[in-house]
Structures are given as C-alpha cells and as structure tokens.
Design a protein with these regions (language model features):
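A conserved regulatory-domain signal marking ACT and ACT-like small-molecule sensing domains
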Residues: 6-143
Length: 143
C-alpha cells in the first residue's frame, strides 16, 4: 500500500476505469479476493456509462496486474492519508487548513487505521509534497 520516498512512505491508490453495469464491482472485488488483496478504503464515481473506482489496497501493484489481465484499465498514483480524531468538525478543520494554505483538494474519501481505529482521510491533490509538509507542520499525522 505504500512506497518509501525520501524520508517518508508514500500512500498508493489504485484507480480502476470500468463500465457502469451490473456485476462489475463484484467482479473487481472478486479478482482482488482471489489474489488475496485487502481493500482498505474505496470510493466510486460514476457517470451514465463509466465509472472510476479508487481504492487503497494491501498490494496495489499486484492488484493492478491482476485487473489489467482481466481487461480493466487501471493505474496506481500517490495520495495522502491523514489520520484524524473521530470528532465532529475535524474534516472541516483539515480542509480549512488546506484552504488557508491555498491548496485545492481534487477528491477525498474515508478509510481507517486498523491499529488505532482512527479515521484516515485519503485525498488527492496536485502537489502532494507541499501538502504533506503543510499538514505535518500543523501537527497532523500524515501517512
């Protein structure tokens, strides 16, 4: 799920492009199950004909290979995971910090830390290194 980069570990996300039709999600999750790959967080965006399934999984490179072999178009990109306390308003506070730093968030979704049980906001932005630095300097736990 991660890759070492300089002095930290980068969180990896699998993006899968698929037709918006019955059984596709079950097929994707079945492929991952057969490869013994755990889904740690996911969000799906759809349109009338196609969708994008974004996932943080236990082995993104293996998942990508298996899904490509099954005919899916997919790729792996860097994302940021930020652990937050499970309290009302914490997402708003995180987003306000980014807004005040002139950072735009492309999309976000929720996962959770299996060890601590705390929520993890997974999000994508244009400049991951800048955002990581900004959040760490303000006391956030960046994964």
């Amino acid at each position: 799920i991660t890759e070492e980069r300089e002095d930290f570990i980068m969180l990896k996300q699998l993006s899968i492009y698929a037709e918006n039709k019955k059984g596709v999600m079950q097929n994707i999750t079945g492929i991952l199950k057969n490869e013994d790959i755990n889904i740690l967080g996911s969000v799906t965006n759809d349109s009338a004909e196609n969708g994008i399934v974004r996932m943080v999984v236990s082995d993104p490179d293996k998942a990508k290979e298996a899904l490509i072999a099954a005919g899916y178009l997919c790729h792996v990109i860097d994302v940021i995971g930020v652990e937050v306390e499970d309290k009302t308003g914490n997402l708003n506070d995180l987003l306000l910090t980014l807004k005040d730093s002139n950072v735009s968030v492309d999309y976000l979704y929720l996962s959770f830390n299996r060890d601590s049980g705390k929520p993890i906001m997974v999000f994508h932005t244009e400049d991951i290194m800048e955002v990581r630095s900004c959040l760490k300097s303000r006391g956030y736990t960046v994964l």
